[in-house]
């Protein structure tokens, strides 16, 4: 909310209000002069003349980019056609944006009963939720080298083959509401003599403790 007061001694003519904001932080900026009717903001607002003793209130609203964290600074400037106008023509406000994210990981196996020499196919789905994007998402899945041929294990991300699986993968930013699917293939060793239990852990900036899911192959 921006309030412009004219304390005199003369009418403030041709008053123009400009809102300075970072387009990487805010989008869809709108303004209202009565709190009910909203208009898209386009570079400046022409407020016309403001009489002595009068004030004008301008309301602003905008959506915050889901990747934004921390302080968001917003500045407004006003100009007038009065040559010798005096007063405060700039004001700013800082709002602290706190992340609101959820991160869910689900792990499954295409076939849960295999024999030595068969290939395990793990399917891992990571879903980001909340009002903020999940940042610096990392998936870790350490295969059991006593039961699986870890050196020949391969993986794919969203259906695209990526090569040899090394145990961890940086998924970067996952936009809220989106999912990433990671497939891992590994051959069961001929010497395998027990169930293959496997655990996946997914962390992010907001959830450093991680979320886990597991699958067991018999």
Mark where each language-model region is.
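Exported/extracytosolic protein signature
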Residues: 1-218
